[in-house]
UniProtKB/Swiss-Prot annotation:
SUPFAM superfamilies according to UniProt: YebC-like
Family to which this protein belongs: Belongs to the TACO1 family.
Subcellular localization: Cytoplasm
Source species, domain of life: Bacteria
InterPro entries: Integrase-like_N, TACO1_YebC-like_2nd/3rd_dom, TACO1_YebC_N, Transcrip_reg_TACO1-like, Transcrip_reg_TACO1-like_dom3, YebC-like
Protein known as: Probable transcriptional regulatory protein Smed_2641
Listed GO biological process terms: regulation of DNA-templated transcription
Hydrolase listed as a keyword: no
One family name in Pfam for this protein: Transcrip_reg
Cysteines joined through disulfide linkages: none
Any one GO MF annotation of this record: DNA binding
Length: 248
């Protein structure tokens, strides 16, 4: 499992999700507003908005918050946000991709650069690390939808490329351009997914020890704490032994 997925599981077990719920809702609302402003405010006619709302619901975002975010775009008074991608290296030469939605590129770039520098890493040029990742679709389901074999069969039938099942749930990957078609087929077989999104998947992972893993987790934590940052991806991996220590 790639390092960032492991990191998220650790933070979930430590209860950090509750501590950052308000910030998470703010990020989800921003994506909903941007999606609604970029197309029609009707999720039935706007695939990006439909996915944004679906992902917000998966995180138990209140219905009122979702509706307010959509209306904000329809009202025409929403800030203008740009989608920006930053790429760099963290401790141990680990590649990191940061996706942001910002109304001030200079502010966000300065903040992201500062976080990388303080962690002993460096912000690079766009394209400096993304070549070592693949842009893919990721569809997740809770374990309750079925066992690994059932989900694997549905995924193959839907045209997905891979399925991983662990204690957190089922993660299905597919080609970036196939997200809509595959997720629709899976919905017919398994019901509505928990999340459907495009992600950066590392082609290879870099093993790190406990010390470096802690530094990388802190880097990712600080990046995700920035209001403008929506997603962070990395290519580090830790052993089960180190994972157990970090989860303790």
């Amino acid at each position: 499992m790639a390092g960032h997925s492991q990191f998220k599981n650790i933070m979930h077990r430590k209860g950090r999700q509750d501590a950052v719920r308000s910030k998470m809702f703010s990020k989800l609302a921003r994506e909903i507003t941007v999606a609604a402003k970029a197309g029609l405010p009707d999720p039935a006619m706007n695939p990006r908005l439909r996915l944004a709302i679906q992902n917000a619901k998966a995180q138990s975002m209140p219905k009122d918050n979702i509706e307010r975010a959509v209306k904000k775009a329809a009202g025409g008074d929403a800030e203008t946000y740009e989608e920006v991608r930053y790429e760099g290296y963290g401790p141990a030469g680990v590649a990191v991709i940061v996706e942001a939605l910002t109304d001030n590129r200079n502010r966000t770039a300065s903040n992201v650069r500062s976080i990388f520098t303080k962690a002993g890493g460096a912000l690079g040029e766009t394209g400096s690390v993304s070549f070592s990742f693949d842009r893919v679709g990721e569809i997740t389901y809770k374990l309750s939808v079925g066992d690994a074999d059932t989900v694997m069969e549905a995924a193959i039938e839907a045209g997905a490329d891979d399925v991983e099942t662990d204690e957190e749930g089922h993660t299905i990957t597919c080609g970036f351009e196939d997200i809509g078609e595959v997720s629709k087929a899976l919905e017919g077989a398994l019901g509505e997914a928990e999340t459907v999104k495009a992600v950066w998947k590392p082609q290879n992972t870099v093993p790190v020890d406990e010390e470096k893993a802690q530094s990388l987790m802190k880097l990712i934590d600080n990046l995700e704490d920035d209001d403008d940052v929506q997603n962070v991806y990395s290519n580090f991996e830790v052993s089960e032994e180190v994972l157990a220590k970090l989860s303790a």
